[in-house]
Each structure stands twice: as C-alpha cells, then as structure tokens.
Design a protein with these regions (language model features):
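Glycine-rich phosphate-binding loop signature in dinucleotide/nucleotide-binding domains
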Residues: 12-19
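Flexible helical/loop "lid" subdomain adjacent to adenine-nucleotide binding pockets
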Residues: 20, 26, 31-166
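ATP-dependent adenylate-handling ligase core
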Residues: 1-11, 44
Length: 166
C-alpha cells in the first residue's frame, strides 16, 4: 500500500512539474516504524526506520520532521495558523501502526519512548551507512569484471560476515 501511495503522489507531482515532495512523518512515526519492524525481527535495514531523504519514481522525497514529536509539529502548525489532515485510518485498531502507537504508551514507563526509539534508529542508520561504505570499499578491491560479468573470489566471499555478503 505504501509503494502504491508513493507512486500515486509521484505521478501527481510529475504532472505538476514538481520534483521534490516533503512528507510530514515525525519522530512518533519513526518510533512506531521501529517498533513494528522489531516485532517482525527485522535486521539492520528495518531497525533504521524511515529514511530522511531518498530518490524514487523520479522524485526527491524528504522527511524533515523526523526529529520532532507529532504534538510539537501540530503545535507549530497551530501557531502558524496552518491546518493539517489526519488520516482516519490512524485511529483504526486493525492496523499495526495504531497497535504500535498504543504499545508505545504502555512501554514508556520502561524507558522505551518515542525519543529513545528514534535515537536508536538514527544510531543504526549511521551503522548502516558505515557498513555500506565498508562494503563499497571491499567491492572496489575484490570485484573484477570478466567476460562482461562481475566476479568475486569464492573463498574470500565465504569468509565475509553475512551482513557484508548481503
């Protein structure tokens, strides 16, 4: 569903000659995402949460409010006299995100808060970036082109950590 929504927004933006879309996700959304991914036993990619910036469907996407709480953003919008639209599905208990939101309230006394989960996602995103950099450097030294294909010495590949192999 998320991919379909992004594709629809991208189609609309391209018809309007818009190249950049800003999304209103907040630290609360990030924490909910991390919690949902934790429930799925996600690896590093899932636990980094939502990306802040990326390019897809010919559009540059950004989430500049990932550092702000949902209520902080709403307070700012109120002070500016700006309205927003809440998706009614955000109150539907059938959806995992709504369940995660409610679970976060229950986990808060344990110190598992929006702020801590968002900070953890940020730390893991930095770790993912470091891993990507290391893999890129390793690929530069190990990968050779042969007969139009790319090869890596099998024995060397087998001795790499699984995250490096992926």
């Amino acid at each position: 569903a998320r991919r379909a929504r992004l594709a629809l927004m991208a189609d609309w933006a391209q018809r309007k000659d818009i190249s950049h879309i800003v999304l209103g996700h907040t630290a609360d959304d990030q924490a909910e995402t991390v919690l949902m991914n934790l429930a799925r036993a996600a690896g590093l990619d899932g636990l980094t949460g939502m990306r802040g910036n990326w390019d897809e469907h010919g559009i540059h996407w950004s989430r500049p409010f990932l550092h702000m709480g949902r209520e902080d953003l709403r307070g700012y919008l109120r002070r500016q006299g700006l309205a927003w639209i809440d998706d009614p599905s955000n109150e539907n208990d059938r959806f995992s995100r709504v369940k995660a939101r409610k679970a976060l309230r229950a986990l808060s006394p344990l110190g598992i808060t929006v702020e801590r989960l968002s900070e953890t996602a940020s730390h893991l995103a930095s770790a993912r970036q470091a891993l990507n950099h290391a893999v890129s450097n390793l690929a530069d030294t190990l990968v050779t082109e042969r007969a139009g294909g790319l090869t890596v010495p099998r024995q060397t590949f087998r001795h790499l950590m699984p995250d490096m192999q992926r």
